[in-house]
């Protein structure tokens, strides 16, 4: 018997057997052990979830703003009370160190839910005077039933990023977590019900993206899809959504983000920022600053500081509190990252440190890849052009500000960017020219609930978090009122 046993779908406020009874395994990437069996949804299950959501959504939307706010706040309290329990599940499912999941994953997800719970009473329309006898007023009404499709790197946080604004606006959601990391989304569903969310308002369907995800994007009963994943999958989502019922779509599709270090930067601080921008969560963060641009004159000194810091990384069992670098999320993903590393070697980049999978001792049965740093990289190399989503840093040298801005923007992605400098005039001047939706100056990675998150170019459509996201889960109804007589031309 696996640690977490058989995991059912969550439909209409209860854990429910799938129609087919088919299952797939959840695997701990730290040791290869099966930790749960998850039921796989099919078309009938999708229809059941949509029907339940359509029944529950009007009940939820009819509640007062304060009633809905109190229910979501209760869910926040439960999440925080169970932080350690949920963190342990997340660590077993993703391989992320417990030191991360305890302090970041559940905490930041709960923060987003609390933020939107507080905004519910502020969701209001407008009154627009036309003339003495007439005016217009607007109402922000829910879209109805919406779908969220999550990625595998921040399972619970992403489930909350998608469900919090959707529920706050009065919608019902059907959420499909990544088939690689599904466990905490199922836990979240139970927490919402325990907090008082009406049956059918939050449903979880586990299974593959090619099947369940596609069914959700094509389903005529769904009004909006919020998707996090890769570009190729995102294009399919958009095509399916447009080809079915012209659904609204929000997508976050990853990046190949530049981190620019200027000559006046504190080099120790710059090295610390580069480490966090590349090796946090074993490099499995969509906003990672994997293209690190350094002035040619400082390149050798910067490389030395990076190598010193990489050697201090504590790689090990993610359940060990001392570990700050765990395995990749799956063995399949480990192999993908290793192919990129091999590509970097073949194309002539200089390997400073790492560049291999860890296969000895206690790490032998896990999906571990050593933190890897390449230097003397060229802009046309595969490791510089493509998103690796692993612990691989590419160091590139440059000569001038104009040159580095041009090269930083020379990518199909546009999710994030950052600069490290003591010259604030330069910082703002450069940031204003970088083609990225999320930018940091002298820091990296923090994303508060108030901060809109999303990309330029192929990195996405729309935004998550912030006030505007709540508005995008509503539709505006305009009503004109005439207080005097009506004159007809007939």
Swiss-Prot record:
InterPro entries: Ald_DH/histidinol_DH, Ald_DH_C, Ald_DH_CS_CYS, Ald_DH_CS_GLU, Ald_DH_N, Aldehyde_DH_dom, BADH
Residues carrying Cysteine sulfenic acid (-SOH): 286
Gene: betB
Site (Seems to be a necessary countercharge to the potassium cations): 248
Active site (UniProt): 162 (charge relay system), 252 (proton acceptor), 286 (nucleophile), 464 (charge relay system)
Protein species of origin: Yersinia pseudotuberculosis serotype IB (strain PB1/+)
Cofactor note: Binds 2 potassium ions per subunit.
Protein name, entry field: Betaine aldehyde dehydrogenase
Gene Ontology annotations of biological process type: glycine betaine biosynthetic process from choline
């Amino acid at each position: 018997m696996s640690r977490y046993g058989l995991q059912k779908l969550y439909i209409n406020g209860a854990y429910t057997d799938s129609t087919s009874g088919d299952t797939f395994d959840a695997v701990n990437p730290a040791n290869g052990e099966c930790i749960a069996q998850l039921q796989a949804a099919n078309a009938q299950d999708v229809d059941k979830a949509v029907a339940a959501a359509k029944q529950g959504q009007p009940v939820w939307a009819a509640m007062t703003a304060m009633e809905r706010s109190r229910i979501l706040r209760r869910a926040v309290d439960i999440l925080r009370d169970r932080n350690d329990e949920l963190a342990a599940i997340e660590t077993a499912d993703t391989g992320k160190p417990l030191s991360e999941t305890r302090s970041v994953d559940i905490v930041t997800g709960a923060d987003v839910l609390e933020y939107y719970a507080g905004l519910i009473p502020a969701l209001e329309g407008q009154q627009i005077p036309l003339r003495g006898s007439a005016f217009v007023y607007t109402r922000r009404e829910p879209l109805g039933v919406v779908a969220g499709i999550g990625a595998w790197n921040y399972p619970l946080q992403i489930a909350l990023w998608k469900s919090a604004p959707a529920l706050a606006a009065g919608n019902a959601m059907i959420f499909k977590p990544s088939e690689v990391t599904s466990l905490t989304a199922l836990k979240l569903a139970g927490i919402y019900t325990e907090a008082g969310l009406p049956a059918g308002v939050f449903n979880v369907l586990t299974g593959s993206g090619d099947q369940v995800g596609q069914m959700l994007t094509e389903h005529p009963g769904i009004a909006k899809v919020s998707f996090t994943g890769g570009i190729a999958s995102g294009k399919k989502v958009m095509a399916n959504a447009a080809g079915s019922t012209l659904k609204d779509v929000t997508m976050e599709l990853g990046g190949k983000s530049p981190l620019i270090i200027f000559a006046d930067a504190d080099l120790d601080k710059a090295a610390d920022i580069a480490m966090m921008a590349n090796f946090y969560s074993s490099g499995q963060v969509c906003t990672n600053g994997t293209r690190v641009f350094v002035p040619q004159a400082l390149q050798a000194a910067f490389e030395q500081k990076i190598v010193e810091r990489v050697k201090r990384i504590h790689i090990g069992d993610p359940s060990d509190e001392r570990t700050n670098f765990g395995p990749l999320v799956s063995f399949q993903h480990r192999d993908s990252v290793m192919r990129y590393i091999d590509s970097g070697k073949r194309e002539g980049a200089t390997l400073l440190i790492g560049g291999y999978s860890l296969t000895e001792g206690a790490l032998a049965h896990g999906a571990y890849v050593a933190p890897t740093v390449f230097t003397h990289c060229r802009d046309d190399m595969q490791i510089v052009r493509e998103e690796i989503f692993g612990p691989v840093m590419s160091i590139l040298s440059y000569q001038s500000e104009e040159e580095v801005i041009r090269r930083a923007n020379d990518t199909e992605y546009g999710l994030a960017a950052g600069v490290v400098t003591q010259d604030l005039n330069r910082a703002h001047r450069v940031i204003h020219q970088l083609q990225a939706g999320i930018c940091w100056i002298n820091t990296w990675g923090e994303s508060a609930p108030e901060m809109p998150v999303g990309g330029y170019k192929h990195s996405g459509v729309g935004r998550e978090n912030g006030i505007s996201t709540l508005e995008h889960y509503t539709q505006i109804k305009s009503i004109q009122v005439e207080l005097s007589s009506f004159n007809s031309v007939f």
